[in-house]
Amino acid sequence: MRRVVEWTQLPGEGPRVLMLPGLGARGAGFQALARRLQHVARPLLVEYPEGPHAARGAGALAQEVFEACGPVDAVVASSFGGMVAAHLAAAGAARGVAFLGSFTRTEHLGPRGRLIAMMGPIAVLGRPGPLTAALASWRPIAPSRVPEVVPTTRLERMTTLHRAFAIRGEPPPPSLRGLPVSCVCIQGNRDVLVPPATVKRLVASLPPGTPQYLLRGAGHVPYFTHPEECARLLEPWLAALAPPVTLGSSSPRPMLQRV
């Protein structure tokens, strides 16, 4: 059982880039994308804590991630990971966020956002497996790789249950629209969990001019199924990532506390 955030930094050059998985996925699913970014970045792969003690919403989880990894240059976030990334960016712990099939508030999901807590019972009672992984990915997944996409063990499913219930129990992250944060949105046109219509609502909460990309044939986990395409879109964004901004006293931003 992982009682704390576990992370691995891959060798590379350039900005320090944190890879954040979704609600029930494993950080290991980012490996293919991370390898393709190593010539322009230093990727960090993260695994969230497990067990009843891990019933933390996105804000509390962002605090745990910050305590483990410290500040980063950018975050590449999938699904629920976008909420965690938004907390980090709003607190000044990340200068850029790439949203891959992601959101920062449940309202971005439309009516289905009110049912986000149901992802927990679905994970426990539905017992996700190859079929669920294929639906999320929009393509067949090798049995050995299914655990990278959906929760397959009882511990993972129960952790997903606890965390899904915790999401609505805390305030959502602040809007990033008025902050000096560089963002980019990548969305699969076959995403059945976070539909493409979500992007319009998400972009409205991000800095003006945030670029949007739609990947044809990609489902909910484009970083897993389309790592080359994602890397091609992320490379120029990482290269253009603005240098750190020194904020005056008129624009305070609360920092997460690292212990």
Which residue ranges define each predicted feature?
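Flexible "cap/lid" loop of the alpha/beta hydrolase fold
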Residues: 90-124
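Conserved HGGG/HGGXW glycine-rich cap/lid loop of the alpha/beta-hydrolase fold
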Residues: 2-52
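Conserved alpha/beta-hydrolase catalytic His-Asp/Glu region
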Residues: 126-177
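Catalytic histidine-centered segment of alpha/beta-hydrolase-like enzymes
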Residues: 55, 218-231
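Short beta-strand/loop motif that positions the catalytic acidic residue
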Residues: 179, 185-187, 191
